[in-house]
Amino acid sequence: MSEVTIVGAGLSGLVAAIDLAGKGHHVTVLERESRIGGMSEFRPDPAGSPFDLEGITRYTGVDISPASKVIEDACVWAWGERFVMPMKAAVKLYMVERGSRESALDTLLFNEAVSRGVNVEFGRPVITQGDFAQLPPDTIIATGLLLESYEALSIPYSPLYGFFAKGTVDHDRTMVAMYFDDFTRDYGWYCTMNGVSFSILFQRDRPLSTGGKEKFRRLVARNESAEFSNWKDLLGGACPVGSIRNPRLFHGNKIITGTLSGVIDPFLFFGMLGALLSGRIAAMAIDDKGAAWEEFRKATMTYYPTYVAKKAFDLLVPDIARRPLMRAALKAAPRVEDRVMGRFANNIPGWRLL
């Protein structure tokens, strides 16, 4: 079987490596960080998504359930008013831990990859256009949100601006609180899992204001009793929503996977499911590009209407109208939670493959 190079040991890169190694390919993964888990300043951090765990196992061949927990408590703060989500829908929201700890999803995937003979080389950054050009054809690129990859490969993106903090908690609850307010046209959140806590406020395209960041910090401290002392600005982030044409499986003579390939919800940025499933699609592309393209097309078919919906929402709904619209929707949500969650999950890139 062939030698395959993968750039990035995140979710999609490792799923691709596991699949290819299982088929007899010799796989080398180049990871810029010194250990598994991605950007150390971010980790460990919990991250949530709707999952069909059995469907993910069937599609990828990897059981991620040991690293996944159902979200027990969820609420949304909309311009200062709190709305509790029942979390009784048939489609469940799960949380996974990202990072290098034994409880992290990254570690689970890394251990599975190594057990199948995958060679992961740490401290191997691939950053510049020249770096990428030197890689062999059919190299799989899985570099996620890193700005340098978008610029080196000339892939459209929206810059991400964030303000985040992490810490620990004295409980083991899996919970999330989302924040919508005048400090961002996107949102922020606070979450806990496995005894760690994480909070972030982010916005695409426009930097966050100093006043907005301070307001969010105060709200998290008051509402969640979370007095973080290590708030930092997120630097160098990018997301593949710079163009309606962002989704791509092939780029030149390379294969693109994960967030970089555009398998992400352009409205709320849910992308973990797409990262996992697209890893398997990238692996498929090594042996059968036509079949892989058909799977990728199915995975990303909801990207385009959601991209248009987000653009229309930002253009046509003024800030003054967002508060009553959001509050009205959240008041109605518990009564139609099952239907809403089903439709929401069905629009996340990748869900229709399960």
Language-model features: locations:
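Short beta-strand to alpha-helix junction loop
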Residues: 48-51, 87-111, 207-211
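N-terminal FAD cofactor-binding segment of flavoenzymes
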Residues: 37-79
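FAD/FMN-dependent oxidoreductases across multiple families
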Residues: 70, 208-288
